[in-house]
């Protein structure tokens, strides 16, 4: 707690302030005016995103219209304190020695990226909090598989699904099936917790299917594939593929452009009388991607993506390589922080080099592309987190071995194995979704998983130290 408070005071004096501007300008949000005046209606007709985060922020904006930024700041600061305690508690559940757990927790909470996300009104911080809380809830269920503990765990999983489409219905179904298999005597408890959650998620998907012909919680998938395919084409490649009939001229337009860019490609959707659907732009001036016209564009972008996957997959390979490169970047290395990161430049560079292994830093992603274009591809790994590039796969392999190899699996208590398996599955599932279906901001998507990576690092360090001390207990990590 002392390290958390001291770091926040120092960051404040360095000029780090809470940024609530995303509420007004980020694509993920509905219009703030609609949050205040037509929140329930707007959430019902929201299809571009799951409704959970807009519900939470919308309630703050609705009840504190002139001071919502201050209220959100307090909420995020409280989340920061809770995240620190949850991370420490999670390692204690695994019986990681106090000095290791405390050291890793301090490094996590003083990390510039963690502090910057704590001061940005976007959903990374709440998702990180929910993931840590869900892990602890699962540990409680594994130790005492009651209906109450099952309800607690699946309620938190529901909150994750309603907040970001990265946590898909398939994710929930797999978790439910796994718990049914692992706890055969507690199947009633698992089903009582899981079935209502699955039904609610299915209802959300069904609502979007009925209204928008898309069985999903988020209709961005089609256009998002364009980011990983046609957006990766050079202008010359795009022209050649258009002339060859491989893709349509839409390939020349970056995905998620404003509606004016698509005149002549699709007809505007008819007015509905529902502002969250009818707006071309929000009252704050950014494109309203919830406009049904974009649904037609999603289909067109997806058709182009399918052609790219089949006839010119090199474009998709570029996206995957960029995604993995970005995945290992320090969490502070994001364009969202371009205005504030210079205020902590010295400490950020020190932390990124010593902890993450980022030995060189580019001013922007455009600079990285210029380095590659100039024949400097072999130098690019020094611009990402080299320690992360090596360390995170090793942690995944180590955790997998703990579950797969009988001679080490038997050292763990059942609740420890279940929790480790859950963290590992969540890391692999969310990472695969992020890195194969998106590009550029993958270190942002990784940030919510860094809590799990930190816990696994604590387990691995403890196991390494214990292995070098003959005669110590071998049960679990100790």
Placement of each model-derived feature along the sequence:
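Membrane-interface alpha helices of multi-pass inner-membrane proteins
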Residues: 105, 150-164, 175-176, 196-205
């Amino acid at each position: 707690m002392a390290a958390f408070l001291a770091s926040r005071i120092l960051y404040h004096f360095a000029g780090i302030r809470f940024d609530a501007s995303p509420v007004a300008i980020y694509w993920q949000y509905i219009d703030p005016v609609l949050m205040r005046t037509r929140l329930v209606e707007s959430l019902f007709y929201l299809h571009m995103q799951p409704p959970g985060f807009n519900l939470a922020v919308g309630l703050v904006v609705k009840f504190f219209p002139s001071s919502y930024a201050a209220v959100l700041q307090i909420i995020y600061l409280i989340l920061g304190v809770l995240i620190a305690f949850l991370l420490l508690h999670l390692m204690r559940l695994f019986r990681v020695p106090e000095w290791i757990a405390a050291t890793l927790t301090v490094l996590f909470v003083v990390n510039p990226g963690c502090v910057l996300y704590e001061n940005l009104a976007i959903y990374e911080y709440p998702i990180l909090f929910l993931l840590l809380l869900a892990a602890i809830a699962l540990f409680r269920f594994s130790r005492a598989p009651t209906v109450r503990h099952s309800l607690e765990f699946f309620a938190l999983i529901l909150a994750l699904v309603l907040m970001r489409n990265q946590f898909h219905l398939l994710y929930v179904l797999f978790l439910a099936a796994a718990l049914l298999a692992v706890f055969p005597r507690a199947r009633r408890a698992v089903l009582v917790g899981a079935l209502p959650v699955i039904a609610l998620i299915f209802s959300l998907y069904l609502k979007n299917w009925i209204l928008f012909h898309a069985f999903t919680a988020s209709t961005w998938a089609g256009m998002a594939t364009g980011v990983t395919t046609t957006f990766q084409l050079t202008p010359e490649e795009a022209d050649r593929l258009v002339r060859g009939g491989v893709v349509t001229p839409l390939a020349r337009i970056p995905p998620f452009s404003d509606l004016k860019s698509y005149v002549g490609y699709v007809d505007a959707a008819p007015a509905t009388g529902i502002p969250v659907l009818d707006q071309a732009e929000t009252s704050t001036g950014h494109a309203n991607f919830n406009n049904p016209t974009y649904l037609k564009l999603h289909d067109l972008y997806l058709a182009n993506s399918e052609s790219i996957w089949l006839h010119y997959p090199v474009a998709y390979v570029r996206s995957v390589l960029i995604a993995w490169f970005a995945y290992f970047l320090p969490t502070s290395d994001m364009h969202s922080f371009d205005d504030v990161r210079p205020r902590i430049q010295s400490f950020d560079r020190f932390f990124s080099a010593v902890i993450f292994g980022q030995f060189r830093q580019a001013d922007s992603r455009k600079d990285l592309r210029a380095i590659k274009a100039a024949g400097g591809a072999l130098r690019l790994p020094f611009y990402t987190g080299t320690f992360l590039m090596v360390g995170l796969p090793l942690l995944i392999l180590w955790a997998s071995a703990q579950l797969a190899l009988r001679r080490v699996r038997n050292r763990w208590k059942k609740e420890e194995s279940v929790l480790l398996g859950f963290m590992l599955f969540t890391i692999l599932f969310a990472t695969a979704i992020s890195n194969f279906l998106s590009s550029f901001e993958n270190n942002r998507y990784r940030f919510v998983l860094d809590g799990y990576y930190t816990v696994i690092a604590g387990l691995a360090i403890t196991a390494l130290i214990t292995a070098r001390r003959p005669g110590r207990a071998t049960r679990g990590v100790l």
